[in-house]
Amino acid sequence: TAPVPACFLCLLALSSACYIQNCPRGGKRSYPDTAVRQCIPCGPGNRGNCFGPNICCGEDLGCYVGTPETLRCVEETYLPSPCEAGGKPCSSGGRCAAPGVCCSDDTCVVDSSCLDEDSERRRVTPEQNMTQMDGSASDLLLRLMHMANRQQQSKHQFY
C-alpha cells in the first residue's frame, strides 16, 4: 500500500506544473514593472517591426501580412517581455504601422488618422514607389484589401 500514496504524490506534482513558463498570470502584457521594448525588427533589411505573429510593417515598406517577411515575427510570441510597435494609437485597438495603415496584433486596416501632415506633402521618389494611383484605383485597392481581410477572418472561424 506504500506505493499508492507515492504514485499519487508524483501525479499531483506533475499535474500542478506550469507548462507555459514564459508568461505571467494574465499574459505577457500584464508585466507591471517591465519597460515596454520595441518589437522585433523584420522585413527587407529589417526596416520594419512586428505587429503580430504574421504582420510586419515599416514606414517605408508598408505592411506584409502572412508573407515570408513575417516569419521572424513568430519569435515575438516566445519572448517574456511585452513590446510595442508603431506610432500613435489608432482604430480597433491598434497602432499606426505605416502611413494610412493601422495594425493590431492580428489585422491591419486603412485608417486616415495614421496619415501625418507631412505625408500628404511628401513626394514619393520613383525608387520608393513605382506606381502612383488616382482616386478610383486606390478605392479599388482599398475594397480588395477589405475583401481579403474578411475572407482571411472567415477562414479562422469554426462552425
Curated annotation (Swiss-Prot):
Glycans are attached at residue 129. It is found in: Secreted. Seven disulfide bonds are present in neurophysin. One of its GO terms (molecular function) is neurohypophyseal hormone activity. Disulfide bonds join 18-23, 39-83, 42-56, 50-73, 57-63, 90-102, 96-114, 103-108. The keyword Coiled coil does not apply. The modification Glycine amide is found at residue 26. One of its GO terms (cellular component) is extracellular space. Vasotocin is an antidiuretic hormone. Belongs to the vasopressin/oxytocin family. This is Vasotocin-neurophysin VT.
